[in-house]
């Protein structure tokens, strides 16, 4: 199994283990040293207990306190439910001050949401090795909703209809990726993951350079769009942001594959049930990233018309 680049899945519970590392597969040495006499003395009691166990309904992973795919799905749905509720709040807040005299939407909701979400994401990532706190993950979803609602309202104000386009595109990418993964046609590999990590580092460096250049006025207002190099330059008539955007969407889709793979590995490892929250958190991080990248790519395309 290839390791996920998503920090949510950095915990050992989501990493592949050898059979010797998996609990319950190798009996302790002390158990193998019981004498035959002791075994015979307890045989009747053990037999009676086994008869009762066989007669009772089998315990599922949830009954034994283990992480399951189904439980992870339910928690993912819950997180996105919280995100949608606060996204509505962010949208209303962004547009509340728009009037004929003041036609500019507020950027406060998505700035607050982005900063709050980033801080909570770091806290969840670095504290989950000791203890998983669902309340922090739910709070992260709430801040991400504020961010998504705010930035979506802002983009919709500038490019009407863009939110529906970005939402449908995001759902399509997630749906196709999930279907291909479930069918076994797409799987993570160590070689592909190495390429993915190199591409991610390159993209982060490019983004940092782009932001710095924008801060220092390298791209004056009205000289090609609000996204710096992404909207200022083009290759064969295609905006650089669209070319990079397509590559980033592919990267985000592969990141989803890594997320799904990590969740399956966590289930195989018998990770405790709270790790389902961490799996749901990891999926949300990737899907939000995917949506924002698609939103920006469509904005660059429409701004270039």
Q: Locations of the language-model features?
A:
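A hydrophobic alpha-helical transmembrane-helix feature that marks the membrane cores
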Residues: 1-305
